[in-house]
Amino acid sequence: MRFVRKNENTKRYVDNIFSVVRAAKADPEAINATAGCLYGEDGKMFTYRCVFESEAKITPAQRAAYAASPAGNQEYIDLITDFVLDGRVMNHYKAMATPGGTGAIASAVNTCLDEGDTIIYPQISWGNYRVIADERNLNVLNYDVYDLNDLFKTIDEEGEKVFLVINSPCENPLGHAYPLDEWKQIMDKLNSLDKEVILLCDIAYIDYATGDPKAYFELFNEISDNVLVLLAASCSKAFSYYGQRLGALIAINNDEEFLDHYMNLCSRTARATWSNLNNAAMLNIADILKNHREEYNEELEAAKGMLKERTELFIRQARDCGLELYQSADGFFVTLKMKDNDERDAYHKRLLDHHIYTIKVNHGIRVGLCSVPLETLDGLAEKMKELY
């Protein structure tokens, strides 16, 4: 007897990341560059003091309570939306709370795509995009983030509806970011299409980018009527609050009536999927955004400075020893270039044999600079080059 649905994905699910993370934690000699979480220079998970001082004030009754609705608490929704958009979007928008950035992405996929539809995301990308696509029985098209012509060619291959995922800035795993002039070209292309276009921007790491990473949001004020922009935001990353599972989905469109309809659809899907949300986490983040922004901003700048030091050190030493990396702008990760995945697998094993724990990605090896203290990182590129 099968019992399960006929169109199930029968491939055995193995999480490539967490299995390596477990192995690293069990190895006392490990150099652990597996994590997608931010760690401090003391080797412990980085936490924002203001986040947990605020959380300590939440009562047991508040922790135990349901959120106001499947879409979340309105105060949190309003504050997180203002925080994410940063005054850049004058177009119509609506938002809802989600269980992490993954919840936002899954909600976007579940409400916009039918089985057999196509999702477009980068060739080298976060592995969970594939899991979400397979779970929904979607077709997949990929594009090269370093080649706009390849992106546009891929978009043109799609028929009646384009569902495009862009993870920028601080792309996982490459650290890639589209500059503003390329964003303008992307939006010009999407606005010119005579079909439905859903642009899903995975902005999980945006708060750790340098410069003006939200400048491209202003382009969403001049979208065509056939374009729906969805922003998937993550409190896990922004507030180093991973286990509490909180994020937001923000929808931007020219038609306010449609947005009301869309948020109703998202709320119903949420009720049928996760039912409710983390009330205490929403109360906490709302309090931080309302009453402790200055403290948060100071701690965020310290975290960004720590990441910048690590990134500059590793990239400089990789360049000096000839360890080839994909071009990186910002973020938690850098990725080594691999000729093919067979070469990648063999190299990854050599690294493991020498207690260097990293994550395999398509045609690459992801190095989580976010999780390696500067002292440990110093000289790591040379060690990895010796094993290449």
Feature roles, as predicted:
Residues L79, S224-K304:
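Conserved core segment of the aminotransferase class I/II
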Residues L300-I315, E324-K337, H363:
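Conserved glycine-rich beta-strand-loop-beta hairpin in the small C-terminal domain of fold type I
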Residues M1-R2, D82, R88-M90, N341-D342, ...:
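PLP-dependent enzyme catalytic core of the Aspartate aminotransferase-like
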Residues T10-G100:
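N-terminal small-domain helix-loop-helix segment of the aminotransferase-like
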Residues A30-N32, A232, E324-A329, T358-V361:
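Short beta-strand
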Residues A61-K195, I206-S224:
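Conserved core of the PLP fold type I
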Residues F163, I198, L230:
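Hydrophobic "anchor" residues on beta-strands that sit immediately upstream
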Residues I203:
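Walker B catalytic acidic pair
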